[in-house]
Amino acid sequence: MLQPKRTKYRKQHKGRNTGVAIAGSKVSFGEYGLKATTRGRITARQIEAARRTISRHVKRGGKIWIRVFPDKPVSKKPLEVRMGSGKGSVEFWVAEIKPGTMLYELEGVSEELAREAFRLAAAKLPVQTTFSLRTVM
């Protein structure tokens, strides 16, 4: 599963996820992309589940790029523990997703195969997505 090798601080504030993605919003590496249209948090497990789905559907053909990385720790207190006595321990890692963020890219397969693979992967993700093609400049 994806998570940082080391961090400066173990825990982070929750923060607010506002605005739209400017950087990382275009298809940069492959021919086709899966772009988020709503905001949310994607866990490392969800990223891996969607990656496996894409990989299995294209029968390990083509090349996949994961354009998001879970770099934010989410802490949680154990069940039935009273409030206070500090922040809980880190439970999992998430990637903050803004509308317009490119999540995955794919090349080396046909467009209909890529569309179907991304449709199946989108079912594993908590954000709404759209299929995106590379625009030649």
Curated annotation (Swiss-Prot):
PROSITE patterns: RIBOSOMAL_L16_1, RIBOSOMAL_L16_2. Pfam families: Ribosomal_L16 (PF00252). GO terms for biological process: translation. Gene3D superfamilies: Ribosomal protein L10e/L16. Keywords: Ribonucleoprotein, Ribosomal protein, RNA-binding, rRNA-binding, tRNA-binding. GO terms for cellular component: cytosolic large ribosomal subunit. It comes from the Bacteria. The keyword RNA-binding applies. GO terms for molecular function: rRNA binding; structural constituent of ribosome; tRNA binding. CDD domains: Ribosomal_L16_L10e (cd01433). Binds 23S rRNA and is also seen to make contacts with the A and possibly P site tRNAs. Part of the 50S ribosomal subunit. HAMAP family: Ribosomal_uL16. Belongs to the universal ribosomal protein uL16 family. This is Large ribosomal subunit protein uL16. It comes from Methylococcus capsulatus (strain ATCC 33009 / NCIMB 11132 / Bath). The lineage of its organism: Bacteria, Pseudomonadati, Pseudomonadota, Gammaproteobacteria, Methylococcales. The gene is rplP.
